[in-house]
Amino acid sequence: MNTSLTQLCFWALQILLMSNLLLWEDVVSVPTIGSGSGVSEMLTEDLFDDAIILSQHINSLAIETRRIFLSNNFSSDMFITFTLQFNRHDEFVVNGLNSCHTLPLKSPKTEKEAKRISLPDFMNMILSILRAWDNPLHHMETELKSMPGAPFAILARVKDIEVKNKILLDRIMKIAKKVKYGFEENEVYPAWSELASLQSANEESRFFALYKLSYCLFVDTDKVEHYLKHLKCRYFDGYMCQDSVNQINLL
């Protein structure tokens, strides 16, 4: 009786060991990250999602910055005046806001136009927009620090945008290296040339430079967000476009 029980336990233990061995072989046989196209595609989708979420956050910060400029005692009088002049089609203000320094990039205005641009060129256009803001964001923060009464809420957001803009640039470069499609980095980007206005002794000129920067920053951060969604949609052959999170609304 005892011998039979011992044998039964022995065989049960053998079966358990064999089961564990087979399970372990199944685990180690799973492809490592990047070894299969399916896993690689998942990782690329995650990179796109991270970049899009970050671009949305930057765009929200740009909107908040403009809202504070329009409502804070430091700048509201000047900003409201410029807004009223724009609504009255004042030539100086309208021309100013229609000449953001990234205008030479000739960004697509419709989805149809965007589809005519190759994926590598589209990627470089997004990178150029981000690089074009390095210098103006730095000077915007520097000059605001020197202006009496400049609220911390604006300074903090401009600094946050500057830092996150660099992070987003790095993340998009990682996507570019994975996407490839003949991608060759083009480090040419539009130069910002209005530092003199931002440093002007004339208060109106100085505040209009800030007004224009805050407006163009909002426009370009919004573009980057929507362009990344468009890029993701095209990279995954369009099936992502039906997702409400990735709806495209090009400016």
Curated annotation (Swiss-Prot):
Pfam families: Hormone_1
Family stated for the protein in its record: Belongs to the somatotropin/prolactin family.
Tissue: Expression restricted to placenta. Abundantly expressed in trophoblast cells of the junctional zone and trophoblasts migrating into the mesometrial decidua.
Organism: Mus musculus
Protein name, entry field: Prolactin-7B1
GO MF annotations in UniProt: hormone activity
Glycosylation sites: 2, 73
Record's keyword terms, sorted: Disulfide bond, Glycoprotein, Hormone, Secreted, Signal
Cellular-component GO terms for this entry: extracellular region
Disulphide bond pairs: 100-216, 233-241
